[in-house]
């Protein structure tokens, strides 16, 4: 039995609307194709995270096809971006930076002068030789946003992305920086601002890479080297009011140290010592999900960034250090606290995640010699390391490796508390160097407990004591120890395990849920922050 004619017409109309709607949402999602209509010679960017970046495709013979990265350079990128309506290019990319998604290639050996209005007007080898290129050689660009921030930087005329003549954006125009007094601190700030966390490798003068075609904007830039942005540097000469010759012979160039897998940087903080943690992986900066993120992870990040340690690892709100379009690279980082680089830690989920950017991990690193803050560690463990049962060197863990105790005021009060936790009735302190304190091995500790203060009352726990934790590894008085007697059961909720040592002796380890406040003191290294 058929449907009434009117109902059939409604059904066909509904189907038509649905089909049109489906066809209009082509490429919606994480990998959008930003570009122009399918007209001969038009171009588009695909697989970028924003509309101003991606692999370059050109429309020819009724099909979109890629551009091979042979001869691909900054002038090609500038023409590409200007054709798409952007002010110019910030960066050019080779080797399928945005992924090996392009399967058909129309153009190779593209070589623009920079004054062309369309990419097809540039010199290139004839269309239609797709077998000469493959998906790993797709050319890409990052275009300057249409509303470029004051003081933005870019490099032009270099053969590789991390070098070139330095240009800055000021009052609506791109122009050069005069090389007067431009040194390593200035280059470090410039390179880090442009995404190269390791800073500058070398400074090039006298227009080494070629000359800017814009005005000469900055002269006598004077940075300390710790600034996050060149606009934070001292500028004794007003922009555009330079004392350089009115030619570009003094244009400064930079060679930035290329990023290395596992490099880290801190973004959008009030200074270089704090911010959202980003890690360099697979040739791109990305964030880390804060699932499982703790003080041990933050401590490794801060040391890798050139600081002594972290003063804050959690309790951030998503908006504290802003949001980013960068990918989320990983989650559940598991550090012991002694690693030199974050990439040396265990990545429980590998390079995968199931997070959103509101969960990006952040840190605040120590900056001053007298930085004193309060943290609340999740778990504190104490162990006695020696050749005999119940006697030896005292070591403490805050979840980031084991630390030695250096305390000139070490007394029987503290020893009694430690022994009580280890399951003994009594305890006596021992000074460094005494026979009872000798341990079977040395300890490479990431920190030193440079003070434990207990009252010595009956059944006192470590959560009732105060600790000062220092990343300064010097200890004039030597490690402290204890001699415990009167073995008994450990306090409720704690356990002891012999994890090493000779017969009749060993290392007694116990887990202590210590929700005390610990006063953390860090010492700033020579030279301040910044990644080595």
From Swiss-Prot:
Record topological domains on the Extracellular side: 31-491
SRCR domain mapped to chain residues: 43-144, 153-257, 264-366, 382-485
Cysteines paired by S-S bonds: 68-133, 81-143, 112-122, 178-244, 191-256, 223-233, 289-355, 302-365, 335-345, 406-475, 419-484, 454-465
Membrane topology type: Single-pass type I membrane protein
Swiss-Prot/TrEMBL keywords: Disulfide bond, Glycoprotein, Membrane, Receptor, Repeat, Signal, Transmembrane, Transmembrane helix
Keyword Isomerase set for record: no
Residues linked to a glycan: 78, 115, 459
Cytoplasmic-side segments: 521-532
Cellular-component GO terms for this entry: membrane
Signal peptide location: 1-30
Keyword check for Translocase: no
Cellular compartment(s): Membrane
Entry function: Receptor for the egg peptide speract.
UniProt protein name: Egg peptide speract receptor
Taxonomic source organism: Strongylocentrotus purpuratus (Purple sea urchin)
């Amino acid at each position: 039995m058929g449907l009434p004619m009117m109902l059939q017409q409604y059904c066909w109309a509904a189907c038509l609307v649905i089909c049109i709607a489906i066809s209009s949402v082509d490429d919606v999602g994480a990998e959008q194709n930003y570009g122009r209509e399918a007209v001969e010679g038009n171009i588009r960017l695909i697989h970028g995270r924003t509309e101003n970046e991606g692999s370059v495709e050109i429309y020819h013979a009724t099909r979109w096809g890629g551009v091979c990265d042979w001869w691909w350079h900054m002038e090609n990128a500038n023409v590409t971006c200007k054709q798409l309506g952007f002010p110019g290019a910030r960066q050019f990319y080779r080797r399928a930076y945005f992924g090996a998604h392009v399967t058909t290639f129309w153009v190779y050996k593209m070589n623009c002068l920079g004054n062309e209005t369309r990419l097809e007007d540039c010199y290139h080898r004839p269309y239609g030789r797709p077998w000469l290129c493959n998906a790993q050689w797709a050319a890409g660009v990052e275009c300057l946003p249409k509303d470029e921030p004051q003081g933005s930087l870019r490099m032009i005329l270099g053969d590789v992305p991390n070098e070139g003549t330095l240009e800055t954006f000021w009052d609506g125009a791109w122009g050069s920086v005069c090389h007067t007094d431009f040194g390593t601190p200035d280059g470090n700030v410039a390179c880090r601002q442009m995404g190269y966390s390791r800073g500058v490798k070398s400074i090039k003068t006298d227009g080494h890479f070629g000359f800017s075609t814009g005005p000469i904007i900055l002269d006598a830039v004077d940075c300390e080297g710790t600034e996050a942005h060149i606009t934070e540097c001292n500028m004794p000469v007003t922009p555009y009011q330079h004392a350089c010759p009115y030619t570009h012979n003094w244009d400064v160039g930079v060679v930035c140290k290329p990023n290395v897998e596992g490099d880290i940087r801190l973004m959008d903080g009030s200074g270089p010592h704090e911010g959202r943690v980003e890690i360099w992986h697979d040739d791109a900066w990305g964030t880390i999900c804060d699932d499982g993120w703790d003080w041990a992870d933050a401590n490794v990040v801060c040391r890798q960034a050139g600081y002594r340690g972290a003063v804050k690892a959690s309790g951030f709100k998503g908006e504290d250090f802003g949001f980013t379009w960068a990918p989320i690279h990983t989650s559940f980082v598991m550090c012991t606290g002694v690693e030199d680089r974050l990439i040396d830690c265990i990545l429980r989920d590998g390079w995968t995640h199931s997070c959103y950017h509101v969960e990006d991990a952040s840190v605040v690193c120590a900056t001053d010699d007298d930085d004193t803050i309060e943290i609340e560690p999740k778990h504190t463990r104490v162990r006695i390391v020696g050749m005999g049962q119940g006697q030896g060197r005292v070591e403490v863990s805050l979840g980031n490796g084991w630390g030695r105790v250096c305390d000139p005021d070490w007394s029987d009060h503290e020893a009694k508390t430690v022994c009580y936790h280890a399951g003994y009735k009594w305890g006596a302190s021992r000074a460094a160097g005494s026979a009872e304190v000798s341990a079977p091995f040395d300890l490479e500790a990431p920190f030193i407990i440079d003070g434990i203060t207990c009252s010595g009352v009956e059944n006192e726990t470590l959560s009732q004591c105060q600790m000062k934790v220092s990343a300064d590894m010097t200890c004039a008085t030597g490690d402290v120890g204890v001699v415990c007697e009167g073995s008994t059961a450990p306090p409720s909720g704690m356990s002891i395990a012999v994890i090493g040592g000779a017969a009749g002796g060993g290392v007694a380890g116990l887990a202590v849920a210590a929700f005390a406040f610990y006063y953390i003191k860090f010492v700033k290294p020579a030279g301040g922050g910044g990644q080595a």
